[in-house]
Amino acid sequence: MRVLIKNGTVVNADGQAKQDLLIESGIVRQLGNNISPQLPYEEIDATGCYVFPGGVDVHTHFNIDVGIARSCDDFFTGTRAAACGGTTTIIDHMGFGPNGCRLRHQLEVYRGYAAHKAVIDYSFHGVIQHINHAILDEIPMMVEEGLSSFKLYLTYQYKLNDDEVLQALRRLHESGALTTVHPENDAAIASKRAEFIAAGLTAPRYHALSRPLECEAEAIARMINLAQIAGNAPLYIVHLSNGLGLDYLRLARANHQPVWVETCPQYLLLDERSYDTEDGMKFILSPPLRNIREQDKLWCGISDGAIDVVATDHCTFSMAQRLQISKGDFSRCPNGLPGVENRMQLLFSSGVMTGRITPERFVELTSAMPARLFGLWPQKGLLAPGSDGDVVIIDPRQSQQIQHRHLHDNADYSPWEGFTCQGAIVRTLSRGETIFCDGTFTGKAGRGRFLRRKPFVPPVL
């Protein structure tokens, strides 16, 4: 199968050019002008459009069981939504397994979840929910099998203490893996939450007040220092929501420490006022939404390069689930927002089309740096001969209003309802196959492939 994309502006992280792009047997074969492929081939006219590498979302939670509920997107509906939003690769954060389980247990479970459902290519982050000799011995074997990143939690049921974190950081570093972390100070949060509950203050706004930005920033600073103690172990901070944490990361970078950070569209475009609306419960997530001042600080990090990745933390619970389980109490509400379908369009509209970032920086944030950090480069995140033919075509001339009824996830609402975006995703190709075109999903369940990722190699800071 050959596909020729003509007359578009092809953009990579290091530059752009108006040229044609030829994909053959799922692989990019040629870029240039006046390409004349062997017949037969499909021709796609991208006049006036940007031709970007397909998005790489390195933070999703599909089919996750959080104890009180299971998310309503599985690996079909979740990856279908991703495809319709221009994302062609996801790396899913696996949920916790049974108490005391081995690392391999969750990998086998999640490969079963995805095998016959995923529309796009996928991988997983390991999750370390306890530390013992067996777990530490298992890490190098998992890296050899293609899992080169693992997540630690400083909050929730399976939070690790500082000694366990140090052991994990050392072994992951030795094994060629990148440590990712959910950083929040669990003890401080528990104290604040207990105060509010005792006072009968359980409305959605108290979710944010119980998890102040200092709880997140303190945990970020602690992880930075622990990573240094562990032999300058590489560290990746997930879902950054505030400027103080970013200041700590800037300081670590200035000291040449190998740290990277992601943020998410919700922290760039939504704010804490959402908790005071009639539907405030739909915005319960952790870390919570912050104020507009924190948004501005994050946008500075997006613009000046301090933030490396924009992912989604897509973790969808329906409003029916939220209301039935929480009964109006924020502390009982399952956490998470949908967003995997909207990430690329939201960042293009609010970043590229406003002049905050260049098209090249858009690629760096949404595909190139995620692929480099997580062992997928140059197969993913790049349009060059030999790379996978993963493409998203965006038309900057089109304006669209986000409406849930047009989305493809399994939620019953969108936090972005009514947002007007300048720029529309008109086509998504995965390994040369069109899986979304002009508003219509054309992919199929089970076509996605499991990606064995390479050991971690730090990009140049």
Swiss-Prot record:
Its EC number is 3.5.2.-. Its cofactor is a divalent metal cation. The keyword Hydrolase applies. It catalyses: D-5-phenylhydantoin + H2O = N-carbamoyl-D-phenylglycine + H(+). Binds 2 divalent metal cations per subunit. Pfam families: Amidohydro_1. Keywords: Hydrolase, Metal-binding. The modification N6-carboxylysine is found at K151. Carboxylation allows a single lysine to coordinate two divalent metal cations. The keyword Metal-binding applies. Substrate binds at Y156, S286, N335. GO terms for cellular component: cytosol. A divalent metal cation 2 binds at K151, H182, H239. GO terms for biological process: pyrimidine nucleobase catabolic process. A divalent metal cation 1 binds at H59, H61, K151, D313. GO terms for molecular function: hydrolase activity, acting on carbon-nitrogen (but not peptide) bonds, in cyclic amides; metal ion binding. Catalyzes the stereospecific hydrolysis of the cyclic amide bond of D-hydantoin derivatives with an aromatic side chains at the 5'-position. Has no activity on dihydropyrimidines. The physiological function is unknown. Homotetramer. Belongs to the metallo-dependent hydrolases superfamily. Hydantoinase/dihydropyrimidinase family. PANTHER family: COLLAPSIN RESPONSE MEDIATOR PROTEIN, HYDRANTOINASE/DIHYDROPYRIMIDINASE FAMILY MEMBER. This is D-phenylhydantoinase.
